[in-house]
């Protein structure tokens, strides 16, 4: 069974429809992100696209900022998931888990690639401990991503496999792999890292916000044929 797939950076109606038609499990929308990135949507524009997520797919708003701003945006848009990707602290993350759970909105939080950022957000640079802290806070998933606020607009950044494994081996909650995933390397990543979810943005687009059906088909085909490690 292949990992679940999250396609992020959706900006167009036709690309949301493509993802739903191809049975992508999670559709991601970068919305009111706190630093300039080419995929950023206004809350109003995201609100126009979210109702198009159907056929079993779930929606995810990727954002950052203060607890109050994120909470208000989530309650307004009502996605299935909110992904905290703007350097939010563990305390803010835990508060948002509690704030949003009654509305059925679950939280995904990044474990940043830099040790300095992990110390700032979690009080420790140890990636396994960061994962355990997030699990205790009640997040749906920890996202190990090559991107953070400092390089959010950079294309092709690749995740550190050792960082991903340190988090995955420390927790029972879902751990998502993001950063540099494309059809050419996803089989190797699945075989070596065994991610529960792959998070892909630039790996299926011809330019920012323009997804390619051919690239998505190639990614899905590679995922289906990948050999995951035995249980």
Annotated model-derived regions:
Residues 1-54:
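Basic, often amphipathic N-terminal segments
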Residues 6-9, 26-29, 81-83, 143, ...:
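Conserved beta-strand positions in the central sheet of alpha/beta enzyme cores
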Residues 16, 46, 70-71, 131, ...:
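Generic hydrophobic/aromatic pocket-lining and core-packing "Φ" positions
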Residues 19, 82, 142, 160, ...:
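Conserved, mostly hydrophobic/aromatic
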Residues 22-24, 76-77, 136-137, 192-193:
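Structural motif
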Residues 30-35, 50-62, 68-75, 79-172:
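Conserved anion-binding
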Residues 42-44, 49-50, 94-100, 201-231:
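C-terminal helical cap(s) of enzyme catalytic domains, especially alpha/beta-barrels
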Residues 170-191, 205:
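A C-terminal functional module that forms or caps the active site or interfaces directly
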């Amino acid at each position: 069974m292949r990992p679940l797939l999250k396609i992020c950076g959706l900006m167009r109606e036709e690309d949301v429809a493509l993802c739903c038609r191809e049975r992508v499990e999670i559709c991601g929308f970068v919305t009111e992100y706190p630093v300039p990135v080419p995929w950023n949507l206004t809350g109003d524009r995201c609100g126009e696209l979210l109702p198009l997520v159907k056929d079993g797919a779930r929606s995810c708003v990727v954002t950052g900022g203060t607890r109050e701003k994120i909470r208000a945006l989530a309650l307004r848009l009502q996605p299935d998931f909110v992904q905290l990707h703007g350097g939010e602290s563990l305390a803010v993350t835990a508060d948002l888990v509690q704030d949003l759970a009654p509305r059925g909105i679950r939280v995904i939080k990044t474990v940043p690639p830099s040790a300095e950022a992990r110390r700032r957000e979690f009080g420790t640079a140890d990636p396994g401990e960061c994962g355990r802290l997030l699990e205790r806070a009640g997040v749906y998933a920890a996202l190990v991503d090559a991107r953070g606020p400092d390089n959010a607009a950079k294309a092709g950044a690749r995740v550190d496999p050792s960082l991903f494994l340190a988090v995955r081996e420390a927790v029972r909650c879902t751990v998502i792999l993001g950063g540099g995933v494309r059809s050419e390397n996803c089989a190797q990543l699945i075989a070596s890292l065994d991610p529960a979810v792959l998070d892909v943005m630039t790996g299926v687009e011809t330019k920012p916000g323009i997804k390619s059906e051919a690239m998505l088909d190639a990614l899905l085909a590679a995922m289906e044929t990948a050999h995951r490690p035995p249980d």
